[in-house]
Design a protein with these regions (language model features):
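Structured soluble/peripheral alpha/beta segments that form catalytic or ligand/cofactor-binding pockets
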Residues: 1-192
């Protein structure tokens, strides 16, 4: 990363701090997306499954209130584990140096049907995209983001009697690592 991130050094107001780790793993046929976010006034854990062949998608989010940094998202994308959940769901991102393990389950993902999966992302030595964007409207507002693209992915997801296989030869992941203090009214563009 370009600069060190320290949540405690932010002067933009405790309720304005936004932090998330978002992973998308995809191939030509389907994708799964996983989110753990601590947006201070609210936390969000999300699982999305997309089937490009139908086309079809479903997202199930669990929100909590006033997380205020209690999720302890890491100050760097290069180390640190992230996990959250209850008895009914869990999402875990484990960083093992040369690879990452993403594991998850949700008892009621859609219509009472569970979803579960485990994906391994290789961490090759490669470039990534990093931006640090100030907001002209407010001098304490900023967006610090790193996107690590094209991470070779392998693993599977189980949902509704179907196994979605992610083969290393044809499946790739992206980590969208975001931290910052946003202005109240803004426009957000996302691409990878």
């Amino acid at each position: 990363l370009l600069m060190d991130y320290d949540r405690n050094a932010i002067k933009g107001g405790a309720l304005r701090i936004k932090e998330w780790d978002y992973y998308l793993i995809a191939n030509n046929d389907y994708a799964v997306a996983l989110t753990i976010a601590d947006n201070s006034y609210m936390g969000l854990d999300g699982i999305s499954l997309l089937d490009f062949r139908k086309p079809w998608q479903h997202t199930s989010n669990v929100m909590s209130f006033m997380t205020l940094g209690k999720r302890h998202l890491p100050a760097s994308s290069s180390k640190g584990d992230v996990s959250n959940g209850t008895k009914k769901y869990s999402i875990r991102f484990k960083h093992n140096g040369d690879h990452r393990i993403l594991s998850f389950h949700m008892d009621n993902f859609l219509d009472g049907k569970p979803i579960s999966g485990e994906i391994r992302l290789e961490n090759p030595e490669q470039e990534s995209m990093v931006i640090v964007t100030p907001f002209a409207e407010k001098d304490t507002a900023f967006y610090y983001n790193q996107k690590i693209n094209c991470l070779p992915a392998s693993g599977s997801v189980e949902f509704d009697g179907q196994t979605y296989i992610f083969a290393k030869e044809s499946s790739f992941g992206v980590l969208d690592w975001g931290r910052g203090v946003w202005t109240y009214d803004n426009v957000w563009y996302w691409g990878s």
